[in-house]
């Protein structure tokens, strides 16, 4: 086992804070409508230009082990916020840096870190409740477009595309983002279905950049039991291999020898296959397999109806134009099923909804209707160059997550104003002792920080703008894009409540952990000794005699 360096107290915290500052300073330049770009080096190909906080954070790895620990903890804030809310990563990083910076001053002054943490938690709890009160539901397509535009760094066209896509497939519908072929963004609605099961083995992945399996015009084998013996599958696999097309297996489970053989065939390029578990459980699983069968024009191979795997033919398999399988989701696009059969199935499920007694059953049945009838909207991102395409695509994906979050939990005024207004709930808050009060003060100060950073990135004087916004009431704030003050909701500067809430909670959680850290253990740098000098060549003596 390698030797470790053990560092205690202020020395450990100071190094970790340095790491936090390096990462946060790199990320926070991207905040707001006038945020700057960050250029990321790639080991091959051109560099990537981005204004996405989490993309910047993910690239940062520091040489100093202790600094790197601090940076990685804040990176966790950004990626957790991105996973939960899909946006707000830069805001979360700015909040975390502020809480750590202010908190360290109090820790250095001898206050109890655990009480500071309790004060911080108390203040964040009150602020989150206040944010929920400030929140209002998104009702119009215009509001959805505004949320999308703000999240895409004030690009109104992206917001409009997303609002249009949500109109087409409904708020519960599936929307994906692809590379376009032209300079303009395009929207295409494709019949399709998504379910929450991912690939059974990462070895099926054939698009490493997106970490997904993409199958073009595949066959779909639907089986309601476990597959563990490859012999059962061989007849079907041989027929599919002859047809020269990929195969997706959807079964209760594919395990052991069967899964291993599929993986080996895939890696060797003999037969392009993928396997996923069937969605749902019990009777619902059977019903959902039947839905997929109708959508793809196949048959569920079940012993109840006298079908076995060994006797399955290509006629029993479903087909689709394209299937995309991620770690947690599978999307079937353009199934080859008969339109009238799909319509009949939807009517049948709607009749079941009418008769359903429990809310849970009703909700699950409605989900099935949406999957069969809703389709998938594809936003094709247009750009002049590949570098611009990647950057724009990342912004569209961010905006899509933000609009989903807005539909889910509502919206609050953007531009850092919601956090300023939520301070009202904390202003009168008191802890059980002075140290907890200091924790509350830390959060009060941190909640100004996103607005300060937006203003700084816009090249204005932060303290003047913050003071003026604090004087105002309600939605009154500063629109950094136009440099005007006014009602931000009317101006269309909106943030999803979920994004703001998640950013604050995650930032406080990780920052509190750092304040209460008193020891850091890291691997000692290896001392590499210089290589020995090579020996001289033999037989070189007696050169003088040759002169």
From Swiss-Prot:
Keyword field: ATP-binding, Chaperone, Cytoplasm, Isomerase, Nucleotide-binding
One record GO biological process: protein refolding
Primary location group: cytoplasm
Subcellular location: Cytoplasm
Keyword Isomerase: yes
CDD domains the record matches: GroEL (cd03344)
Enzyme class, spelled out: isomerase
PROSITE patterns: CHAPERONINS_CPN60
EC number, as in UniProt: 5.6.1.7
GO cellular component terms, A-Z: cytoplasm
Residues that hold ATP according to the record: 30-33, 51, 87-91, 415, 479-481, 495
MF terms (GO), sorted A to Z: ATP binding; ATP-dependent protein folding chaperone; isomerase activity; unfolded protein binding
Catalytic activity: ATP + H2O + a folded polypeptide = ADP + phosphate + an unfolded polypeptide
PANTHER family in the cross-refs: 60 KDA HEAT SHOCK PROTEIN, MITOCHONDRIAL (PTHR45633)
Family: Belongs to the chaperonin (HSP60) family.
Subunit annotation: Forms a cylinder of 14 subunits composed of two heptameric rings stacked back-to-back. Interacts with the co-chaperonin GroES.
Function, in words: Together with its co-chaperonin GroES, plays an essential role in assisting protein folding. The GroEL-GroES system forms a nano-cage that allows encapsulation of the non-native substrate proteins and provides a physical environment optimized to promote and accelerate protein folding.
Protein name in the entry: Chaperonin GroEL
Taxonomic source organism: Cupriavidus metallidurans (strain ATCC 43123 / DSM 2839 / NBRC 102507 / CH34) (Ralstonia metallidurans)
